[in-house]
Amino acid sequence: MGYYSLTETTAIQYAKEHGYFEKKANVVCHEIGDGNLNYVFKLDDGEKSIIIKQALPYAKVVGESWPLSIKRATIESKALQIFAKYVPDYVPVVYSHDEELAVTVIEDLSRLTITRKGLIDGEGYPLLSQHIGRFLAHVLFYTSDFGLQSEEKRVLEGTFVNPDLSKITEDLVFTDPFGHYDTNDYESDLQSVIDELWSDKTLKLKVAQYKYKFLTRKEALIHGDLHTGSIFSSPSETKVIDPEFATYGPFGFDIGQFIANLLLNALSREEEKRSVLFFHIEKTWSYFVENFTKLWIGEGVEAYTKEKQWLPIILQNIFTDAVGFAGCELIRRTIGLAHVADLDGIANKENRIQAKKQALSLGRELIKYEAKCADIQLFRTLFQQTVGGVKA
């Protein structure tokens, strides 16, 4: 029959035909997706529920004028299975994948809340940073040359060649927000700050270097879009979802994206309410270092993991890269194609513009002066110095 787009009715038919519900079951289906690239259906018969996710052959946010390969659904399914191999507690269960229809049937996580929404609503999620730090350490280590034999790594790397979605990252994170491109989207009150940003040749040179790192450093399997909208949370659980951007890339990329999205939430808050975000930023890094170090010492397969001076260099490089990637993400999410509710949801215009100016200034500083952030404490200092000097 070939590919066709599911509807709520045909999603029910698909689920019944594949044995997820009895033929006579009274199944309720709702399309619940709010993303840019897929349909997401929740199906429930009152006793059990599942999620059916289908990749569309175009970007919903733009329309059919932006075609995309549906093979990304297979990449997403494989990535979730790789993640589950190393950190099963932090990803949903994948029940099946249909490559022809680009359909993946996965565990329903309705008991949890999208982390971005929870943070905006004031939730703290005390275990978020511990779980994400551990998730990142295990996935990045075990899919790198340090935790995987080089032959196996090369094979796995080939599995995750993801040209369509990697091109989106190249354009929307590293290129378009730094010049006059039609994809950019911002309020006119920001124009003077943006003009200054776009005329900063030192900044552009640094961004060029980070784009080059993304293009060429195939260090480990990365999620590729690890923002707080790609994580479900509760006070006791954390689940990473939507790795359709998964590819081999730099160690620091996912860490930087996650940190940037915590910073965006921090910027949406009054100063005295930001401490929980810095707790998570600092703890994410410390848990990452703790877990990565244990794996390096106990599970390292590369000969030079036995050299004691090598690990500190690796960790410093990862952190420095993460800071720069975080800066790119801050700018992209403020003036690029895909914004975040943390900033756009600020009702008071003056406060919203101030927060966005702060995000742009902070992003610029993190990219240009990432070397100033030699450790997590200096990172916080740079935040305070930069944000404190920006007014609406």
Swiss-Prot record:
Pathway: Amino-acid biosynthesis; L-methionine biosynthesis via salvage pathway; S-methyl-5-thio-alpha-D-ribose 1-phosphate from S-methyl-5'-thioadenosine (hydrolase route): step 2/2. It catalyses: 5-(methylsulfanyl)-D-ribose + ATP = 5-(methylsulfanyl)-alpha-D-ribose 1-phosphate + ADP + H(+). Its EC number is 2.7.1.100. It comes from the Bacteria. Keywords: Amino-acid biosynthesis, ATP-binding, Kinase, Methionine biosynthesis, Nucleotide-binding, Transferase. InterPro entries: Aminoglycoside_PTrfase (IPR002575), Kinase-like_dom_sf (IPR011009), Methylthioribose_kinase (IPR009212). Gene3D superfamilies: 3.90.1200.10, Phosphorylase Kinase, domain 1 (3.30.200.20). One of its GO terms (molecular function) is S-methyl-5-thioribose kinase activity. GO terms for biological process: L-methionine salvage from methylthioadenosine. It is an enzyme of class 2 (transferase). Substrate binds at D225, R332. Belongs to the methylthioribose kinase family. Catalyzes the phosphorylation of methylthioribose into methylthioribose-1-phosphate. HAMAP family: Salvage_MtnK. NCBIfam families: MTRK. This is Methylthioribose kinase. It comes from Bacillus mycoides (strain KBAB4) (Bacillus weihenstephanensis). The lineage of its organism: Bacteria, Bacillati, Bacillota, Bacilli, Bacillales. The gene is mtnK.
